[in-house]
Amino acid sequence: MSDVVVVESPAKAKTIEKYLGRDFTVLASYGHVRDLEEKDGAVLPDQDFAMLWGKDPRGEQQVGKIASALKGAKRLYLATDPDREGEAISWHVKDMLAERGALKGKHVQRITFNEITKRAVQYAVAHPRDLDQPLIEAYLARRALDYLVGYTLSPVLWRKLPGSRSAGRVQSVALRLICEREAEIEAFRAREYWTIEGRFTTAAGAPFTARLTHLEGRKLEQFDLPDEAAAMRAKKLAEGGSYSVASVEKRRVRRNPPPPFMTSTLQMEASRKLGMGAQQTMRTAQALYEAGHITYMRTDGVTMAREAIAAIRDHVKSEFGPNYMPAAPREYASK
């Protein structure tokens, strides 16, 4: 008799089943198993925002497989992703199984892990919890708002602007921000200005470049050389002078390493260094996560597990020596 574990993807299911052994059956939900009915009235504001859930054929099929596996099990572990959507999927799976009567006499618990490693998975199974109701309610509020905004505004948009796309809780606001920014760009008027730089050599023969900042006893402002004629006049005046280094200042600059990636910084860095779009970045990160190479990537937190920090410090010390490691781990706070 094996316990049943439900995750989101089949690739993750295979890995976790390997870690847990033959006493566990690990099945995938393949993402969300149901959603709101695609019709007017799926969310009822006058009835305490009651929500009508439609049936998804694939979701029904997967829940049926889970129900069959539960016939010989005592426990059901809901191990979907450790975020709001993951909590929602677990809630939907539990609710649909309860409707089928598949949970009678079964102990249902929620487990989460931020990395797919044997240690993390086994620790999660040993420390289960109940479903996080506030997180589920946050999902329900988000889903209801998405529906109400989309189904209310989209028909108006289509009537006023035939051929336009749908409206949305997030996309409509984002579109306004883009339009406002575009209006600012169109209102911008380019203005010409010139700067002058000179090439010098130190007594030791080292070359360096310096910018002209003062002319005829006055500091040059950004638009004081508005055209080529003014720049050439300033250049001629500058060439007639003699120059010496008045002082040299040396400063030690300390630069702290960046905190661990969260979703937004991961996407920005992948775009800057690798030229990857947001979707490609998240697909790649998802594959790395499911293979156990990185921690969960959909997060706005920057804290790391103590065990992970200790392992990293041991690796740095053995590979590069103690001089490359601070005396104590750096602490980063999530905003």
Name each model-derived stretch.
Residues 14, 18, 61-71, 91-95, ...:
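Solvent-exposed alpha-helical segments within well-ordered globular domains of core cellular machineries
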Residues 6, 56, 60, 79-84, ...:
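Conserved phosphate/pyrophosphate-binding and hydrolysis machinery centered on Walker-type P-loop NTPases
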Residues 106, 175, 294:
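Conserved ATP-binding/catalytic motifs of P-loop helicase motor domains
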Residues 71-72, 116-200, 247-254:
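C-terminal or mid-to-C-terminal helical accessory/interaction module adjacent to the motor/catalytic core
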Residues 132-135, 148, 291-335:
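Extended, highly charged linker/hinge segments and catalytic-adjacent loops that couple domains
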Residues 25, 34-55, 167-286, 290, ...:
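Long, highly charged, low-complexity internal segments
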Residues 80-82, 268-270, 298:
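Short glycine-centered, acidic/aromatic-flanked micro-motifs in structured strand/loop junctions
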Residues 1-140, 225-226, 333:
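Intrinsically disordered, low-complexity regulatory segments
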